[in-house]
Amino acid sequence: MKCLLHYANFLEMAELEWFTFPLRKADRCLIQYRGFLIRERDAGKLMPSTVSEYMRSAISFYRWALSHGLLDVTTPLWRDKAVYVRFFDSVGFERTILRLTTDLSIPNKTHLGLRLEDGLLPVSAADREALLELAKTSSSQELYRMLALGFFTGMRLGSICDLKIQTLENAVEDPVAKGLFCINIGPGASPPVRTKFGVTGRVWIPKPLLDDLLEYANSLRRSKRQARATSENKYLVFLTRYGNPYCANDSEQSTSVNTEMVTFRRKGMQAGIKVASSFHFHQSRCTFATELATIALSTTDPINAIALVRDALLHKDEATSLKYIKFVTQTPAKQAAANEFTRAFMGINNADKFQP
């Protein structure tokens, strides 16, 4: 349903009808949707796998509509073609399967190289401080605290928007790390807090941030929002000015946050913060994970570092955590290579510059 909703939103945005297929192919809704998806993928707004799934779902919908007589067109919507896929089974024998595809399908072209969660990269410590200072002075109190939670706990936006006041009140200080508290999130926590893949676990939160959130939870600003909220939403830490949750049920996305992030990026560019032009909320989580991996590798072996990152970020498996470890271990080599190339280039430039 999410895929079809995306297609329906595109049709509404482009002011197109789903059942209109003119003779000119470029004017057809499916062709325009395909081009839109490819542009979104190339701009980094959608993952290649997501784009392929969206297009596949749209084609499946039209197959269903045609088979049930809901669509009457005289021109073919696409050309079917057979594709043979070879693979090796668990025993090691080569197998071949026949798949039916179309000329409208979008191949899942993955990017080469190491990619972190959602294909985003962390920001530097200096950029993090600049972004937080900008959010504190130029954005809403809610966005500032959400970004602080992302940068210093690594929680996803869906979990932050579903955070309960009681979750903060139940925080327990880590016995071996003074100044760090632990909060329980996930479907198995009490109260439950939404997490991706339904993983239950503990998240670290610094004491100053915890104290600030508890103070905000009892502030007049939030009390006014709580008064407008329904009984089931009154105990959420973050509420919109209309008393609604920032994220819909079972959603990792927030329209309110996305809208404010657009304004935030614009103000960041005006303030001269270059990283703000392409900054996404999820980069706060990437930044936390990268810094945690760096600290972990400096104090323990890679195996324990992977386990630490996995537990702190509530990864479903260790494969995602391993990406951060690899990213951190590759960074010094990249920096050394960049410095060497810069020195070599400057040497060539200077030699040319002062050559008689």
Predicted regions located by residue number:
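N-terminal core-binding DNA-recognition domain of tyrosine recombinases/integrases
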Residues: 1-94, 133
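Short, charged phosphate-coordinating catalytic segments
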Residues: 68-72, 150-179
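Basic, Lys/Arg- and aromatic-enriched nucleic-acid-binding interface segment
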Residues: 125-157, 305
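Conserved tyrosine-mediated DNA breakage-rejoining catalytic core shared by Y-recombinases
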Residues: 163-212, 223-229, 233
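Active-site/catalytic core of tyrosine-dependent DNA strand-transfer enzymes
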Residues: 206-276
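Short, basic (Lys/Arg/His-rich) helix/loop patches that form interaction surfaces
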Residues: 258-311
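Catalytic-site neighborhood detector that most strongly recognizes the C-terminal catalytic loop/helix
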Residues: 313-338
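C-terminal secondary-structure termini that scaffold catalytic or DNA-interacting sites
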Residues: 339-356
